[in-house]
Amino acid sequence: MTVSGPETPEPRPSDPGASSAEQLRKEGNELFKCGDYEGALTAYTQALSLGATPQDQAILHRNRAACHLKLEDYSKAESEASKAIEKDGGDVKALYRRSQALEKLGRLDQAVLDLKRCVSLEPKNKVFQESLRNIGGQIQEKVRYMSSTDAKVEQMFQILLDPKEKGTEKKQKASQNLVVLAREDAGAEKIFRSNGVQLLQRLLDTEETDLMLAALRTLVGICSEHQSRTVATLSVLGTRRVVSILGVENQAVSLAACHLLQVIFDALKEGVKKGFRGKEGAIIVDPARELKVLINSLLELLTEVGVSGQGRDNALTLLIKMVPRKSPKDPNNSLTLWVIDQGLKKILEVGGSLQDAAGELTVTANSRMSASILLSKLFDDLKCDAERENFHRLCENYIRNWFEGHGLAGKLRAIQTVSCLLQGPCDAGNRALELSGVMESVIALCASEREEEQLVAVEALIHAAGKAKRASFITANGVSLLKDLYKGSERDSIRIRALVGLCKLGSAGGTDFSMKQFAEGSTLKLAKQCRKWLCNDQIDAGTRRWAVEGLAYLTFDADVKEEFVEDEAALKALFQLSRSEERSVLFAVGSALVNCTNSYDYEEPDPKMVELAKYAKQHVPEQHPKDKPSFVRARVKKLLAAGVVSAMTCMVKTESPVLTNSCRELLSRVFLALVEEVEDRGTVVAQGGGKALLPLALEGTDVGQTKAAQALAKLTITSNPEMTFPGERIYEVVRPLVSLLHLSCSGLQNFEALMALTNLAGISERLRQKILKEKAVPMIEGYMFEEHEMIRRAATECMCNLAMSKEVQDLFEAQGNDRLKLLVLYSGEDDELLRRAAAGGLAMLTSMRPALCSRIPQVTTHWLEILQALLLSPNQELQHRGTVVVLNMMQSSKEIAGTLMESEVLEILSVLAKGEESPVTRAAAACLEKAVEYRLIQPNQDGE
């Protein structure tokens, strides 16, 4: 009896649409056998929608359960099997599949009940009996572990509750043990059931840092991926109490509370899903209400007096992660709309606060940037003009209120808020800047005697210069003011910001060599001053950041790039600043590096279009002579020598909302430029570039992920993957590489991904299974038909290595496909490398699946000519592959051996067998020995 595959019910003529439903079932069964479980699932779903009898529905539901089991979506597998059981309580296959799903979900007690029913229905079924024994053993092991865990938890609780313990050392040790114990599900459950949450609440109330950290980390274990325990924990501690811990002065405690709140949010948001632990918990009536309470508490924390700046930043970080949709495919953005209505003004209040100013909220140097990122993500999450208009209206009302009704202090806050918007949702910032009197106030305050007012105004002017239209206006009206500030101010903080404003205006033409805002040589002077300030250790990091901002703009000019990479001290200062606590510098550093490596997108203009544009007297961008490939390669080598990879690796590790997806994209572009030359890849790997590329390839913008994946492919092609990505890290490389196989990627990216996957597939079976699990095989097969010979060859080589896996061999052995035919035909192509790959795959498949040997003569009438051509090839590798295929075919069937011996193959093998000792000679001799064994030929008198 088979319990894992799909079944086909008999169609009933009386059922409307029975023939089409039956066709869909058959299609689903074939797709299931071929390993296309998603396709099979779709076919079964369509068959269900046509309307069927309860018996047929039960079979289709259990077929869907089989698909979900293969796809490792165990919650859905359980649901489908349960539907089948509802329609037929004695459906033993559905019961068995549900038991498999329940086992994977950790619900062993329920899985045992289903298996016992299976055994009672079919007592002689050995599969059921063996499964029941296995689960019984798992339950006994869990009971033993729980017994030992009980004793550990009890002992630690006694120490923590003992009033006689005067010192805290024992208590701290016990609390740390609780943290370790809570990482295991059994331990977390025991702590929870032993009134552990109440005890941990008492530890939080001690306000001792070590005990608070231990309590928070233990709570992480209790709440992690467990919705019911999370809700129970919140009911004991109170959501507002947990959120309030974010605001403490101690940075470590605030970060621990931030981690706990992230875990709580994940548990509430996702609920019971695939792979979650402890599904026997309580049912939650309305998790959405708990989510809103949590988010509302975070919004209130933003504007509470007495909250630390670090706590405010952590609250913003959580809101950035929690609120916006993860994917635009998700149609529900109601949480974003609710946050905008309830908390937009609170976010703007943080963004408009001045650091270290009297009467202002306590903020850090990173607070405004974090607020900008949150505002940007909220704005990007809006779906229609009406929602965006509401966002604009709320921002404008807030700014207008401060600008018009609170005197000079109100104007400063309004302008600071505009700067925050310009750094985030710039459309909203530009609209706010156009409000009556705002731009005039910015210009006027630039001439103020007070440093605080000048700082706010100059920064707003810098951010306003981002748009070409506004840059032209400021060039005409504000350059003289910025120059006066740069030359006349006695404060470095003002001078450096004025310099950045000039840099930004000077780079308004971008990489266009023909468009220069300032006179020749002016940008070089500005860049020199930026480098001077950057290298000055006496200036604080927050001020030096502006020097990097200036260089980020000026490095559009190739002359500036050349001077910058020659200045070793400036490069080292840049890399040192990127490692500092001044996180807001990351984007500027990334921008400068992208400019120096020319890793932005650039397409060579069509010469005909250029001529047409000149004829029409339209402006045609010109490339700087020093942006040619030879100059770019030289700059890349200088950056590598200066240690750019180590600096970028540290930037990737940054756990801050400032490391936005756009910033990740910049780093991905630079990494791709660094690994362009083969001789540079060893340096990148040695300095940790391979490790840094993995998170960039898995998270970020689509462009950034693709660039990082391509860089990973280049490293995998030319370096030993096991050394480049040691340990478990090598398995994380597969998914980014498979993503490069999509049709949206370029031909070069497809080719490099195929070559990299070929290398990985040749390492181990586990890696091959990972490639199969990522559904790469259908895409690789598609590229085997590609017209481009290099892509076709790479795909064939990849399939050759994958053919060592049983699942791929099953695909070739399945009836009704041309996979084997394609390999046979490719073995006779003119492209020698393609022939080598195809013949290698053919040799491997015929060795592992002898049944395929009898099908080779059936797939094409030219099979004999192709084999003879392989045997006669001057290439030893092709000869060896050909002789192995012939040997496998002869070993599989006497009839095929007879056909081969009746052809010229016999004469060719006789010649090959007499050659010098080699794999070809041995294989040819083995073929002749098999022919003698079959009595198809006679040995000569010498016994040869």
From Swiss-Prot:
TPR repeat spans: 21-54, 58-91, 92-125
Main subcellular location: cytoplasm
Keyword Transit peptide applies: no
Tissue expression pattern: Detected in spleen, bone marrow, lung and ovary, and at lower levels in testis, kidney, heart and brain (at protein level). Ubiquitous. Detected in uterus, large intestine, kidney, spleen, lung, brain, liver and ovary.
One Pfam family linked to the record: TPR_8
Coiled-coil zones: none
Region of interest called Disordered, as start-end residue ranges on this chain: 1-25
One term under GO cellular component: cytosol
Alphabetized UniProt keyword annotations: Acetylation, Chaperone, Cytoplasm, Developmental protein, Differentiation, Myogenesis, Nucleus, Repeat, TPR repeat
Molecular function as annotated in GO: Hsp90 protein binding
Modified residues (N6-acetyllysine): 70, 483
Domain of life: Eukaryota
GO biological process: cell differentiation; chaperone-mediated protein folding; muscle organ development
Subunit structure: Interacts with PGR isoforms A and B as well as with NR3C1 in the absence of ligand, and with HSP90AB1. Binding to HSP90AB1 involves 2 UNC45A monomers per HSP90AB1 dimer.
Function of the molecule: May act as co-chaperone for HSP90 (Potential). Prevents the stimulation of HSP90AB1 ATPase activity by AHSA1. Positive factor in promoting PGR function in the cell. May be necessary for proper folding of myosin (Potential). Necessary for normal cell proliferation. Necessary for normal myotube formation and myosin accumulation during muscle cell development. May play a role in erythropoiesis in stroma cells in the spleen.
Name recorded for this polypeptide: Protein unc-45 homolog A
Species of provenance: Mus musculus (Mouse)
